[in-house]
Amino acid sequence: MRIMVDTNVLFSALLFESVNMNIIFNEIAMNHKLVVCSYVIDELQGVTKEKFPAKIAVVEKMLSKMSYELVYTPKIIDESLFEIRDIKDYPILYTAVIEDVDILISGDNDFFDEKLEVEKPLILRPREFRDMFVL
């Protein structure tokens, strides 16, 4: 399966020691295809620069060593595909939809709002992904 992660999941995986994130990313690397969109990369770099400026080089190095499919998030997007509470999350889900990814992993509550309706991808929290796919 093609599995996309949002900014907070990638941020947690790269900057914090987490057994759960290590397990999740190992599962993806071994059995699936990790997908990262350009919007997430840009957002990750911005958040790192703002909150952890000393870690910018670490993030850059890790991103360059990771194996993933990089997909482009268009600058001009169709804003009528779905409604999401936080408009800043729209480009991430939009990219997941147009790139036909199977699963989007996010810890952001806006992706789990009951009003959000998308047929695909399946949106899971990190723990849900682990419980469903890690044996």
Where do the language-model regions lie?
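A secondary-structure boundary/capping signal
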Residues: 6-7, 37, 107-108, 125
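Alpha-helix capping/helix-boundary segments
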Residues: 9-10, 40, 92, 110-111
